[in-house]
Amino acid sequence: MNYGIVFGGASWEHEISIVSAIAIKKALKADLQFIFVDANREFYLINPSDMRANFFSSQKYKKCKKLYLRHGGFVTHGIFGVKEIGVDCYINLIHGCDGEDGKIAGMFEFYSLKFIGPRLEASVMSYSKVLTKLLALKCGVKTLEYEVINRDQKPNLPLPYILKPSHLGSSIGVSVVSNEKELDYALDVGFEFDGEILVEPFIDGVREFNLAGFRVGQNLELSIIEEPKKGKMLDFEQKYMSFASSSSNEADISKE
């Protein structure tokens, strides 16, 4: 089977998506086509030999063939006409907006393309921390007290608390506020990325776990549960630099 790896996107997490695509090139032993989405949402067909970070940061990708989407998949335009690139199934590796918020899922569904990744409804729900909170409460999942603030509003929860842009991942824009002096700067940082901020009590020393899963027919396949090392909070650097450079260990969780 020929897989199309779609990565990049107009997102704050653009570079992480590139790193993910490079990683899947090493890990997935299959026929792969690499489809890069730049900040202007233009599509490019990338040669596997060019899959390295500086190829994209140097803008060399602009010399690659541009791709165009139609029913049936991506095609190239040339002097000999239109040519399909021949992909059986697409894998969505775009991080953040475009990839995780449902845009790419909706595009795949609209053009009747087979793809691996969350569907439109699941993407929309999970990309919003506020909607995820509401869903968790509806399903009876224990969750922290919270409030949602917009610009020109300030939290009412007692200190310390943690501020999280509602529609963003990778801990970007997240701040822990321990006293009133730290609040204005933390709000400026959060609202730089989103117009809506989720506020929760900050609990020092809380354990965090990673668990991946996917559905095969009626069954769910789950990975081992990993526990990343962190400092006060699991920030961007620890998620993608420190954690990526060390081997991950299965979390030690009691049955209780």
Residue ranges of model-derived segments:
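ATP-binding N-terminal substructure of ATP-dependent carboxylate-amine bond-forming enzymes
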Residues: 1-116
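Active-site nucleotide/adenylate-binding loops and adjacent lid/helix of ATP-dependent enzymes
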Residues: 2-22, 32-33, 80, 123-207, ...
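Short clusters of hydrophobic/aromatic residues that line enzyme substrate/ligand-binding pockets
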Residues: 43, 120, 174-177, 233-236
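Short catalytic-loop micro-motif centered on adjacent basic/acidic residues
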Residues: 90-93, 116-118, 145, 198-200
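Glycine-rich phosphate/pyrophosphate-binding beta-alpha loops
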Residues: 95-96, 171, 229-234
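Short, acidic/turn-prone active-site loops that include or flank metal/cofactor-
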Residues: 119-124, 227-230
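Phosphate-binding site of ATP-dependent enzymes
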Residues: 179-256
